[in-house]
UniProtKB/Swiss-Prot annotation:
Residue stretches making up the UvrD-like helicase ATP-binding domain: 4-472
Reactions the enzyme catalyzes: Couples ATP hydrolysis with the unwinding of duplex DNA by translocating in the 3'-5' direction; ATP + H2O = ADP + phosphate + H(+)
The protein, known as: ATP-dependent helicase/nuclease subunit A
PANTHER family: ATP-DEPENDENT HELICASE_NUCLEASE SUBUNIT A (PTHR11070:SF48), UVRD / RECB / PCRA DNA HELICASE FAMILY MEMBER (PTHR11070)
Organism: Lactococcus lactis subsp. cremoris (strain SK11)
Length: 1203
């Protein structure tokens, strides 16, 4: 094997030592390769691998690095000619599993467990990894603490009156949610510092102590104003010299009078004499802004100043930059009057937060369960307070290696300082890819070292890896052209010069000369909407954008590109559902890396939550009626109305059910035999469930409901059935997690879910088994570290998220708390009101300072997010956005005034831009970027839409699924249906027939028609759980149904073309089954299938095989004479020539081959249904039907069914 040729910089990064080293590794520069090779070189030099501390950002990255090291160490040993060196490499391989390679969280846990006695905790602590449990504990602590303060507990440090003022400053509408949000925000921020209590005590009020008036604000507050003033006067002077005023002489004296104030204004700003500045500026502002068209000066200045004047001065309704500054001054002069009161609120907030932090930590100690941040703080305390432990570790580790250093937090930085001996840090990262500010990572840590290490006198070393070995030149050049004009120190936190620019390193793979076919392509959907509607949407994406991308993706796939080589990157996962639905409509396989959204709002979960509420309290009418109306019991509007009129309007619906059952209501004659039987069946089941509430855990109750009512099977047959089933399983997992946390009782669980929904929170759903060759959909953040041949960036026009800049508190590490203060301006002379209060929410000085810092940091991070997204593409980048259709020139004239200031896009466009699309189009206008532009409309989309015929539409479940998703609308219908419908149905049998049936139900119904008195009722099939990652439900007994279900899932994903023990075992391991279930799947026996002729046929026709094919079919019941839908999923079929080979797996247990004929008879009707569906779908007459019997002794039996 030829040796990889290293660049000089890579070679330096691998071999340099004896000092702290910072490797600035651009995207695609091979940083993981460099780190792995450096470790191998250290081992060769005699450093044992367990003497290296290697920190990665994620567990996945740690796992991948271990695998890479195993491969590289083996390769190095094989190539080594030195026996001693080979021995070292062998020893490293042996110790690799024990090496300190992992996240900082994993290391701090290990350190804390080993030294638990130094921080007074139990060594058997557990991590509060489940958000639900930590939310529960935190909520309880918060509520108890608030209650204590409101009860006037004298032992506490805030009086009741002052505490009530504190709450009112952040909350409204008589609740404390606003205050609670503020407390949680501050707690989270403090937890990311190296010593939360110290920060809260010493830094939290620093801003209030520093910024008490306008004159305390930094030079940054006035520097832009000076620039804007100079620009303003320059415009006026140009107008006097070359403009309309010079030519016509109109208003020359008045203009000169304005210019006379120039020096006084500039001097007032320099001295921070804001009173003088305000008076002088407002006089100028009035001269320019006020007047009529007869005012010669005004008319002349309007012509000369045009848009630039508006930007600087503006009007009251739309103030310019200078007028905004004046407004800030006025605001500042007002807030100065209330600074003392605001400081008192801030001080009380500090006291409460400290008390909350300590109480919450004490509660976690009692539970012996901690958050990751707690463990990190314990670890820091252990190292700071115990020099012996600290020095032992420093002596033990020869080098401290940190991957993704740009995403390090201050807590992690403190850990590194404590572990390092001062000259053995090896840090790898890329400041341009620091995108985790929302997790409180601080890119400033990287930047500070980057600048200091670059100084000649600094003993430490900076190494730059600029070559990109991932992408084509077209992608790299476009990326460079964007960011060299976008980033600088002021905004972006760095200048994107030659040293930062990407350099193509894969010249042998991709040509240096640009090819226009690979130019990045900007797809703009021209939509019939206003600009406000477009820009006000932070993350909303239109169908047109997705369809435009889908058509391009379809073209790529048809040209031979594998779906797995294509990625769609989005700002937020909130659009995942829509993207998946549209891509599937184009027959494009798709994977949602972060799943579908709104788990708690999915209809199948909403129905189950109503059922739990009704079980907990049947007197809750809405949930009880929802339960009756749901597919589990199927009461229709007529039946519910008949029940409703059994009592007065104010009588509970549950009481009306009891009256109906006893025939003692107001209108007993309306409870016909059919409804009576239906009510009895419901009451029997409902009563049983209510009794079980105190006998079995909630998650087992849920599964009992799922299986007994066939509800799990039912939702699985609907559109997106696998995801619906995953949602139901997720609800069960959450219930189990809740109970394992020490909480018991259905009432508390329902209350918890209700609170989540009230606060618009969601819970994570369970992942389902995903197709391997599919287009990936993920957020920009999720894509970091990945690469794809073709990348689509969606929703470019969406606005940047500026919600954090509008919150009641904004925090900074240096200045602490910035908060808004609610003042009563009733006594102010300019305020006239008849109300007893004139409450106004104002920004305090620390808030203004923190807001400005946060805004710049947020825009800088947005630039880096865009950089990360661009650099995921190997071959081609697609940018997808949206514009309004009312614009001329395709809606792009907005950017005509975009200009460069030097090499950088003007501050006006960088600061005022609302999204990525603004930046890109502004630069396109100013610099002519190397990209294609394609503007398309809805009509063009429809015209160009492709027709796909690769597979018949088995999923004709849309109408029924929509009916299911809108099932809750029945409540309005009930209100309208108050008239008594006193009649018998002409088709009474139809009331007993479900409108939707599975093949199992059809089979059962077929049996029922043949039963004679005294015969045994047929047993229903087990419910199949398709495509699920099974969760651990404790030490319960594994049922035959679970084993059968898992076996079906395995058969679906097993690659029949590689039917061997190794391949099948690997597939089984990847599927994530519970270990107990996995051990019950007999792969050796399954492999005997491929010793048969039928098995060989399957392995030879994998490309013609369709597995897990859903279908729907309309049938007519012979007794009810009514139509109903049959839905199901057949395990698979093979289409060859003019016939179809249908097969279905059966896991029924049998020990004697004589039982096979009985099994064949049992499933004959079901297989005939599948056959009928395939005949209709493919218009094929010949369907050969086979049962693959997996439950027999020693081997798999294949049986053909007769027609």
């Amino acid at each position: 094997m030829s040796e990889v040729k290293l660049t000089p910089e890579q070679n330096e990064a691998i071999h340099s030592s004896g000092k702290n080293i910072l490797v600035s590794a651009s995207a695609g520069s091979g940083k993981t390769f460099v780190m792995a090779q450096r470790i191998v070189e250290k081992v060769k030099q005699g450093i044992e691998i367990d003497r290296l501390f290697i920190s990665t950002f994620t567990k996945k990255a740690a796992s991948e690095l271990r695998m890479r090291l195993e491969r590289d160490l083996k390769k190095a040993r094989q190539e080594s000619s030195d026996d001693e060196e080979a021995h070292r490499l062998t020893l490293a391989l042996h110790n690799l599993s024990n090496a300190d390679i992992g996240t900082m969280d994993s290391f701090t846990q290990k350190l804390t467990k080993a030294n638990f006695n130094r921080v007074n905790i139990d060594p058997n602590f557990r991590i509060l990894a489940d958000q639900t449990e930590s939310d529960l504990i935190r909520q309880e602590v918060f509520e108890q603490l608030v209650e204590s303060y409101l009860s006037a507990d004298e032992s506490l440090n805030i009086s009741k009156d002052k505490f009530e003022k504190l709450i009112k400053n952040f909350s409204k509408d008589r609740n404390i949610l606003g205050f609670q949000k503020v407390v949680y925000t501050i707690y989270r921020f403090a937890s990311a510092t190296e010593n939360p209590i110290s920060w809260l005590e010493n830094q939290f009020l620093k801003g209030f102590e520093t910024y008490k008036s306008l004159t305390d604000l930094s030079e940054d507050f006035t520097v832009n104003v000076k620039e804007n003033l100079l620009t303003f006067f320059e415009l006026l002077e140009n107008s006097l010299t070359n403009g309309v005023i010079a030519k016509k002489g109109a208003g020359r004296d008045k203009a000169n009078l304005i210019l006379d104030n120039k020096n006084e204004l500039l001097e007032a700003i320099s001295k921070k004499d804001f009173v003088t500045f305000t008076a002088l500026f407002l006089s100028i502002d009035t001269d320019i802004r006020v007047g009529s068209s007869k005012d010669e000066t005004l008319s002349a200045l309007k012509k000369d100043f045009s848009a630039q004047k508006q930007d600087l001065v503006g009007s009251k309704s739309k103030p310019g930059e200078l007028r905004k500054f004046v407004d800030k001054i006025k605001h500042g002069q007002l807030i100065e009057k209330y600074q003392k009161q605001a400081f008192e609120i801030a001080s009380d907030l500090q006291k409460f937060i400290i008390e909350f932090y300590k109480t919450y930590l004490e509660r976690k100690k009692n539970e012996n369960a901690f958050e990751y941040s707690d463990i990190a703080h314990f670890a820091i305390e252990i190292l700071e307070e115990n020099p012996d432990i600290r020095e032992n570790l420093r002596e033990h580790y020869d080098e401290i290696m940190i991957d993704e250093y740009q995403d390090t937090s201050h807590t992690q930085e403190r850990m590194l300082e404590l572990l390092s001996n001062g000259h053995n840090l090896f840090m790898v990262g890329d400041i341009k890819q620091s995108i985790y500010g929302f997790r409180l990572a601080d890119p400033g840590l990287f930047l500070e070292k980057y600048k200091s290490y670059d100084q000649a006198e600094n003993p430490n070393q900076l190494i730059r890896l600029k070559e990109n070995f991932r992408s084509r030149g077209e992608v790299l050049n476009f990326t460079n052209d964007i960011f060299k004009h976008l980033m600088d120190e002021k905004l972006g936190e760095m200048t994107y010069g030659k040293e930062k620019a990407l350099v193509q390193g894969n010249i042998s793979d991709y040509p240096v000369e640009a090819e226009k076919d690979f130019y990045p392509e900007l797809l703009l959907y021209k939509e019939n909407t206003s600009e406000e509607e477009i820009e006000d949407s932070e993350v909303k994406i239109s169908d047109g954008e997705i369809k435009g991308a889908a058509q391009e993706i379809k073209k790529l796939i048809e040209s031979g590109v594998e779906p797995k080589d294509i990625a769609i990157l989005v700002r937020s996962k909130s659009n995942n559902n829509k993207i998946e639905d549209i891509l599937l409509s184009y027959d494009i396989p798709v994977i949602l890396d972060e799943g579908r959204v709104d788990f708690l709002k999915s209809m199948e979960v909403l129905i189950m939550l109503d059922i739990l509420r009704a079980i907990d309290n049947p007197l809750y009418d809405l949930s009880l009626v929802a339960m009756l109306r749901s597919p589990l019991f199927g009461f229709n509007e007529d039946e519910l109305t008949r029940i409703s009129v059994q009592g007065s309007r104010d009588l509970r619906f549950w009481d009306k059910i009891l009256l109906s059952l006893k025939k003692e209501g107001k209108n007993p004659e309306l409870i016909n035999l059919s409804l009576e039987q239906k009510l009895k069946a419901f009451n029997q089941k409902f009563t049983e469930w209510r009794k079980l509430v105190n006998q079995i855990p909630i998650h087992r109750l849920l599964w009992k409901i799922y299986t007994e009512t066939y509800y799990f099977d039912y939702v699985g047959a609907l559109k997106n059935g696998e995801m619906r089933q995953a949602n139901l399983q997720a609800l069960s997992v959450r219930a189990e997690s809740y109970e394992s946390s020490g909480y018991k009782g259905l009432f508390k669980f329902v209350r918890l879910i209700n609170k989540f929904m009230e606060q618009n929170n969601d819970l994570a759903s369970v992942n389902i088994k995903l197709p391997q060759n599919a287009v990936r959909v993920m957020t920009f953040h999720k894509s970091k570290g990945l690469e794809f041949d073709y990348v689509f960036l969606m929703n470019l026009q969406s606005r940047f998220n500026d919600r954090d800049l509008k919150e009641d508190v904004i925090l900074s590490r240096e200045h602490g708390l910035g908060m808004k203060y609610i003042a009563d301006l009733k006594a102010e002379p300019d305020v006239i009101t008849d109300f007893p209060y004139a409450l106004v929410k104002m920004e305090t000085f620390p808030y203004m300072v923190n807001k400005d810092l946060k805004q710049r940091a947020a825009l800088s991070e947005e630039m880096r997010v865009l950089y990360v997204a661009f650099t995921r593409a190997k071959k081609k980048l697609y940018l997808v956005g949206k514009i309004k259709d009312t614009d001329k020139k395709a809606g792009l004239e907005l950017y005509d005034t975009a200009t460069l200031e030097g090499k950088i896009l003007s501050d006006k466009f960088r600061n005022s831009s609302r999204g990525f699309q603004h930046w890109i189009l502004a630069l396109q206008n100013a610099t002519k970027l190397p990209m294609k532009l394609n503007v398309y409309t809805k009509d063009e989309l429809e015209t160009e839409k492709l027709e796909f015929t690769s597979q018949p539409d088995f999923k004709k479940l849309v109408e029924e699924s929509e009916k299911f998703d809108n099932i809750m609308s029945f409540s309005d219908e009930i209100k309208e249906a108050q008239k008594i419908m006193n009649y018998q149905y002409p088709h009474q049998a139809a009331t007993e027939l479900s409108s939707i049936q599975t093949p199992s139900q059809v089979k059962k119904r077929s049996y029922e028609k043949q039963l004679q008195v005294g015969e045994v009722q047929p047993v229903s099939e087990f419910v199949r759980v398709k495509n699920l990652d099974f969760s651990d439900f404790g030490s319960k007994k594994i049922t035959a149904a679970e084993i059968g279900s898992a076996t079906h899932s395995f058969m679906q994903y097993a690659d029949f073309s590689q039917a061997d023990l190794f391949s099948f075992q690997a597939t089984l391991d990847e599927m994530g089954f519970d270990e107990k279930i996995k051990n019950q799947i007999d792969i050796t026996k399954i492999l005997t299938l491929f010793d048969t002729e039928f098995g060989k046929f399957l392995s030879e026709n994998v490309d013609k095989t369709v597995k897990e094919a859903p279908f729907s079919m309309l049938r007519t019941d012979e007794f009810a004479k009514e139509q109903y839908i049959v839905r199901g999923i057949c395990d698979g079929f093979v289409k060859i020539a003019d016939k179809i080979i249908l097969f279905d797996y059966k896991t029924d247990r049998f020990t004697n081959v004589s039982a096979i004929s009985e099994i064949k008879e049992r499933y004959k009707d079901q297989m005939n249904l599948y056959s009928e569906a395939l005949q209709k779908a493919y218009h094929v007459n010949q369907i050969d039907k086979y049962l693959i019997l997996l439950g027999g002794p020693r081997k798999v039996f294949v049986e053909k069914l007769d027609d």
